[in-house]
Curated annotation (Swiss-Prot):
ATP binds at K17, S176, D177, T220, G221, G222, M223, A224, S225, K226. One of its GO terms (biological process) is L-proline biosynthetic process. It holds the Pfam family AA_kinase. Substrate binds at S57, D144, N156. Keywords: Amino-acid biosynthesis, ATP-binding, Cytoplasm, Kinase, Nucleotide-binding, Proline biosynthesis, Transferase. The gene is proB. GO terms for molecular function: ATP binding; glutamate 5-kinase activity; RNA binding. GO terms for cellular component: cytosol. Pathway: Amino-acid biosynthesis; L-proline biosynthesis; L-glutamate 5-semialdehyde from L-glutamate: step 1/2. Belongs to the glutamate 5-kinase family. This is Glutamate 5-kinase.
Amino acid sequence: MSEHREAVRTARSVVVKIGTTALTTPSGVFDANRLASLVEAIEGRMKAGSDVVIVSSGAIAAGIEPLGLSKRPTDLATKQAAASVGQVALVNAWSAAFAVYNRTVGQVLLTAHDISMRVQHNNAQRTLDRLRALHAVAIVNENDTVATNEIRFGDNDRLSALVAHLVGADALILLSDIDGLYDGDPRKATPDKPARFIPEVAAQGDLDGVVAGRGSSLGTGGMASKLSSALLAADAGVPVLLAAAADAGRALDDASVGTVFAPRPERMSARKFWMRYAAESAGALTLDDGAVRAVIKQRRSLLPAGITSVTGRFHGGDVVDLRALDGHTVARGVVAYDQAELASIIGRSTHELPVEMRRPAVHADDLVRT
């Protein structure tokens, strides 16, 4: 067994993401029995000593039948109505399944916006930490009744990666109808063009030839979403296992199935992870070539002298993108000036500025490369 599978197998704190297709029948009906089977596997991991946080999709699917709908809705308002009804059924199903093992569950509804705002981010972290301290099983889901982009893209894949870092998890396990990563669609493979299974992703070269497909009609997250989320978590220092829900027992027991994603050697700090992946950008600073070198290669602070233009409306303490002259983002950071104030001093050397304004536009400690 590789060291990365071993890391998943022995992880003491685990986030398990359950996709919509793992909780529904082939016809799209929410299936409480499937959920109960997953809880049995999760309970086995918890009895072995691991702390588990669950990120559960399926609210919209769970609301289809109670509302008398024949299929998953396509318009936003009906999706949100289905989510409103389905969320009740979903959390009740989780609660009933864990009650068999005398465990209490707590529901945490989030949107990407909640994670992006530092105050809400910290509040969510405290809530999850307290639930775990009280030995309750946290069931996290996106708040689909108010979310917009989140309800259409990701199927909780990205949220699970953010939650994994939020709670300081040692591993992230993604369970759905996808049994791992392939360099082609296995459903369309032929003897002449087989789809090669990729057991481990440890370097960019391991992804050569990988084609990211679309999700099923029941969920919204396809291979592209799962791959992006797995790489996000791995880049932050969290090992990831992508496996089929049908193999949940083995995935949670010994990590012997699916594709494992190797984490970066050093775990990213919570603050830098938030800046890079969670925070919403309030604007952008365009840097000259010298400033890009100073920030990226020399890891120095960004001074007003190296900024050529400022866009957006931001205040000191907001997160902004740092862009090269060709427009691509090279870093993100917490800006020390309001937009109007910074715009008035860009391109000027520090000694030209009043004493009270001789500070970096973005300090090196508040920068993260992208």
